[in-house]
């Protein structure tokens, strides 16, 4: 039975304020400076100095500007580091706009296929509503980028540079989502009118033709081949003529992307450890690589990341940067904002409770480039972000180990460095992963909620 808030109750609450001695000072501080500034601790700057015992040199950072391409920038950063080192190309960047174009195009087809497949359900069905709420966004996953690279390859940034619409993607997303919603309703109508598969597919092709034209107009037409011309750090001139994006990846990166797998730490009741999971409606390339995550206990999760760093390879990872972060200082720490002291309230929650209640979810991908080990235990981590070089330590952030425990959810690891039991668990589960609901927090990096 519901009960309203009475004015007597409000009077009691008002009287209770006097029981909190720091209320007056806290109120002045919060109202003058805002909650976060008023509760900010300076100790994090002391504890998180950028010194590390295991560190990989990765050079200058990139800048995703006003777009949600963190997952793409971070993944391409792991690859460009390899190119920079092997071919002596300091400052080299891969084109994030190139993979952005093909991601938008493939996501459009992915959306239409899901709309056609769910056309028998009412628009009010939760899954259908989920599809139409955000037909596509800038977000994505490591496996989704692998699917794009396996199909389209990659190119240097100077071959397919940024545009106004890749650097600030709001108008592009608004335009594309309008086209997708309109087209999606048309496809649903055709299916429900009993039109043939051929007629439905013909209309989908017309819709994709219009979308391709819009993307080419907004971002430029991606190259089928190009000349890769550069001078290396030793002053030597090179030219690789008429190379395709697919061959560029094979020649200059050369990774077998199947050897890189996603592991997560999702300590919720619906995700048993050592099992592989996928997320419904999460993907981009129809018929391409499926998003798959192997769930591991935190201690194992962390141990494997440290081992990869020791082997000299950086680690792509997904986290929740909306919690405990100071963007200007470049710090990620659970103690940086002490709201419990400001409000005399216990804000603590378990990692599982945050995930289950919507308090936390993956919303940003970055790259781990270093760890500081004291007595063989991690104390802090160095993070390559993609927000430009004006924040943090020339664009790098320092993450406390406690923040890692609470807000790091995913990492991509090279199978070459994994123990046999972890490889076996992944290989046994990857063909028939447990499918999570579309709105699961382990899929949140790819969606706008």
UniProtKB/Swiss-Prot annotation:
Coiled coil (residue ranges): none
GO cellular component term of the entry, any: cytoplasm
Classification via Pfam families: Peptidase_C1_2 (PF03051)
Compartment(s) where it occurs, according to its Swiss-Prot or TrEMBL record: Cytoplasm
Annotated family: Belongs to the peptidase C1 family.
SUBUNIT field: Homohexamer.
Gene Ontology MF terms: cysteine-type aminopeptidase activity; cysteine-type endopeptidase activity
Record keywords: Aminopeptidase, Cytoplasm, Hydrolase, Protease, Thiol protease
Catalytic activity: Inactivates bleomycin B2 (a cytotoxic glycometallopeptide) by hydrolysis of a carboxyamide bond of beta-aminoalanine, but also shows general aminopeptidase activity. The specificity varies somewhat with source, but amino acid arylamides of Met, Leu and Ala are preferred
UniProt-recorded name of the protein: Aminopeptidase C
SUPFAM superfamilies per record: Cysteine proteinases
Single GO biological process annotation from the record: proteolysis
